[in-house]
Amino acid sequence: MAGFKVAIDGPAGSGKSSISKNVAHKLGMTHIDTGAMYRAVTLLAIENQIDMNDESQYRFLEDVQITYRDDHIYIGDRIVEKEIRSKAVTDHVSLVSSFPYVRKKLVEIQQKLGETNNIIMDGRDIGTVVLPDADLKIFLIADVRERAKRRQQDKQNQGYEVDIEKLIEEITRRDQLDSQRKISPLKKAEDAIVVDSTHMSLQQTVKKIIELIQSAKGVINE
């Protein structure tokens, strides 16, 4: 099915990137994690020691190439998968992504990537802003405590111990920032299908979304 596009939106910790990546691999589609792109900008802001509250400081994006290919996020020729998952980046990415200039630059890149045939793109404004004409829009949700548990497990797998209550606090704060920002707030597209993964495993959620894709457009990988 040439040109079939899936938009998956959802709050922090809902598992949208892991799920989207798994679905894309199973169906032979291209996965694009837009959240990783905002994290890359945040990483650059930290490395360049700019005033992160000053939108004009992000003009460095005119001279930087941020791309997403083969399941990796690149700044120029540098793969930054590990660096963008740091606590410093996580703490500041909502601020950075709230600036109209930053969003404009990255949405341009994302829409260009969206011209690729058979893609699954995940983020917070894909169905509403980046790919409003997507063939299938999914809004992935999960209970805050469940999202915190998943984030804690991810951190433990990386060798870190994190307090669950602190993670709940951080995720709740992130939800508020993402849903209340003036530019491209996190919200469900009117024609999006809600998938609640609170009581579903990763593979169960992947299976559910594959079923939705197949229902919407037939079996893509036949």
UniProtKB/Swiss-Prot annotation:
It comes from the Bacteria. Pfam families: Cytidylate_kin. Its EC number is 2.7.4.25. It is found in: Cytoplasm. HAMAP family: Cytidyl_kinase_type1. Belongs to the cytidylate kinase family. Type 1 subfamily. This is Cytidylate kinase. It comes from Acholeplasma laidlawii (strain PG-8A).
